[in-house]
Amino acid sequence: MIEEEVLKIIKPTEEDKKGIEKVLEIIRERLNKLDFEVEGSFRKGTWLRQDTDIDVFVFYPKDVGKEYLERNALNDIINRIKDLDYTLAYAEHPYVIVNINNVEVDIVPALRVESGDKAITAVDRTPFHTKYVTSHLDERGKDEVRLLKRFMKGIGVYGAELKVQGFSGYATELLIIYYGNFRKVLEEASKWKHPIKIELTKPMKIFSEPLIIPDPVDPKRNVTAAVSLKNIATFSIAAKYYLKNPSIEFFFPSKKVEEKVKGDVLILRLNLDEKSSEDIVWGQIKRSVNKIERALKQYGFRVIDVQAWGDTNNITIAVQLESKNIGQYYLNIGPQYYSQTIEDFIQKNDNIWVGEDGRLYSIKERKEYDAETIAKKNIVLKVKYNIESYWLQNTEDQQIMKFLRKTPTWLK
């Protein structure tokens, strides 16, 4: 079976585990005497081979408050690991990423709380997530989670960060706990129609998102609140097609695709001068994408697609139009002859005439008819950046090729 082949590739070996334990030993020595725990997929046994980020949580008494985590706790952690290769990262509050032997370790300060529903910061729930998952999954269940994670990665819907708006690792674990195995998740997902409710516990509030999985450790929270409708639909379609025709392509899609340029494609390459939180940057990028699309449509361009990809430093925005050429003048449709607004229309316009349908018309000059200028004006990044822009002629860039192709390789 395809799943068994995939498991051989993605399931960590004993050698892999020993390598991670060596990395953890270095971290344990540095955090000696602190209240810390290993969390995340490694602790839960659902991690993927060659795709290991270790989460280490350092806990402080809840009465010290969130500000203490951002200053004192963070400084304490940095002082203990400052001779290692580390960088600062930002989520709800700052944390440290340490790189040891090409393994990333996230060291996250958190508050020690009595239960998941008493969480003060988002990460305070994590140990309760770990306990819930480890108490509900056996070894086979952990492999089923691995398959679901790799499937979601392959089709591009894995990751709860704003850039992806997909499924978190915890969400995949809950799906396996609820449905039982990988195949059963796909069978049910192939029939989804939103709103979808998956209740391992009764919700403590009304949720409005398209996919609702109340958190078993904090029923006031929807685990899948961040999952976009686009990713829910993509997962449902992929599930349907995999069940009809299983293929390793769903798990490991072809890296090379080819497609010719259709319409006119504007490429905007953004290089950010400042480091910032990934979610903050991608929140602004997503607003920029929406704003660019709306503005171009308002000015009369026929927009095929606008997408963005990249990291927190280098971002590409691709704009595909039916044509970049648009007239300097356009037909302005006015009111019917009996409307009370005709005087206002006549006063504000030139080149006015009455059409065969009894409606007033005029010719108006567009305020802007250069698509490149419009796109650049509607980028709303709040950090300093440099921009390079060009109209695509041909390319070997695989991300651009995927943008041009649209259809994922697992679908066709």
Curated annotation (Swiss-Prot):
Pfam families membership:
CAA_C, NTP_transf_2, tRNA_NucTransf2
Enzyme Commission code(s) on record: 2.7.7.72
- Recorded GO terms, molecular function? ATP binding; CCA tRNA nucleotidyltransferase activity; magnesium ion binding; tRNA binding
Q: A Gene Ontology biological process annotation?
A: RNA repair
**Any keyword tRNA processing?**
yes
Q: Which cysteines are joined by disulfide bonds?
A: none
Binding locations of ATP = S41, K44, H129, K149, Y158
Q: Which CDD domains match?
A: NT_2-5OAS_ClassI-CCAase
Keyword terms, alphabetized: ATP-binding, Magnesium, Metal-binding, Nucleotide-binding, Nucleotidyltransferase, RNA repair, RNA-binding, Transferase, tRNA processing
Q: What else is known?
A: A single active site specifically recognizes both ATP and CTP and is responsible for their addition.
Function description: Catalyzes the addition and repair of the essential 3'-terminal CCA sequence in tRNAs without using a nucleic acid template. Adds these three nucleotides in the order of C, C, and A to the tRNA nucleotide-73, using CTP and ATP as substrates and producing inorganic pyrophosphate. tRNA 3'-terminal CCA addition is required both for tRNA processing and repair. Also involved in tRNA surveillance by mediating tandem CCA addition to generate a CCACCA at the 3' terminus of unstable tRNAs. While stable tRNAs receive only 3'-terminal CCA, unstable tRNAs are marked with CCACCA and rapidly degraded.
Subunit structure, interactors included = Homodimer.
Describe the family membership recorded for this protein in Swiss-Prot or TrEMBL: Belongs to the tRNA nucleotidyltransferase/poly(A) polymerase family. Archaeal CCA-adding enzyme subfamily.
Q: Protein name, please? A: CCA-adding enzyme
Query: To which species is this protein native?
Result: Saccharolobus islandicus (strain M.16.4 / Kamchatka #3) (Sulfolobus islandicus)
- Organismal lineage: Archaea, Thermoproteota, Thermoprotei, Sulfolobales, Sulfolobaceae
